[in-house]
């Protein structure tokens, strides 16, 4: 399990240990308050060479929860920056049940509202819009699973929800291919592709939370 996802490359790997020691010997920390430094620039260039064309900016965060907070703030700021004030109403988030995105306030609002670890905060965090738990991929599931809803049926329901709420939805946030802390539940890549196409059709941004799936953890560099 690699500490769920924090140690995907193993424990005490000599290359990682050596890199950490080398960095500490050079300098341990420089804040990004209007500054940068050579290791950050090198890491940025390395990351941009890995990601799909069109992704050309990196924002460094110190945890998964903070990365979700920042991604949501970017989505909200995007709509708020438009001169068309009707777009300023796009403040809600769309996600599906069974997910987990972190423990700070905004991520808690898009974790499973009934069966997750944050049910205590119902009525306090901002209410969001939830699709049903995605139907399992019966071929890759880690436990016996029955696909009681087809991808086509699920996407038909998702389109209905988007049609009814697109004017107020800023972004859709999901864990692609596998819901991590929500139970290691796999769903079909076709479901992700279909949901992205619907979001594009209804003018909704898409946020992929790949804290648990990115950088080779699911077999490819990124799951999305």
Region locations from a protein language model:
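Conserved N-terminal phosphate-binding loop of PLP-dependent enzymes in the Aspartate aminotransferase
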Residues: 1-224
């Amino acid at each position: 399990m690699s500490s769920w996802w924090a140690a995907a490359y193993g424990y005490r790997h000599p290359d990682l240990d050596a890199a950490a020691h080398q960095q500490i010997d050079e300098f341990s920390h420089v804040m990004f308050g209007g500054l940068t430094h050579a290791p950050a620039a090198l890491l940025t260039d390395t990351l941009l060479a890995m990601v799909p064309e069109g992704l050309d900016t990196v924002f460094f965060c110190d945890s998964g929860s903070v990365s979700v907070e920042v991604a949501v703030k970017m989505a909200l700021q995007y709509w708020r920056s438009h001169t068309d004030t009707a777009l300023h109403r796009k403040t809600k988030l769309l996600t599906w049940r069974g997910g987990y995105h972190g423990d700070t306030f905004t991520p808690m609002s898009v974790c499973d509202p009934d069966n997750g670890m944050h049910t205590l905060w119902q009525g306090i965090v901002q209410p969001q819009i939830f699709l049903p738990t995605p139907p399992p991929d019966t071929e890759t599931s880690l436990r016996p699973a029955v696909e009681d809803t087809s991808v086509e049926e699920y996407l038909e329901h998702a389109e209905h929800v988007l049609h009814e709420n697109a004017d107020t939805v800023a972004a859709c946030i999901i864990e692609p291919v596998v819901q991590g802390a929500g139970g290691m539940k796999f769903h079909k890549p076709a479901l992700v592709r279909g949901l992205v196409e619907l979001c594009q059709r209804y003018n909704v941004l898409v946020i992929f939370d790949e804290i648990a799936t990115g950088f080779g953890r699911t077999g490819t560099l990124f799951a999305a």
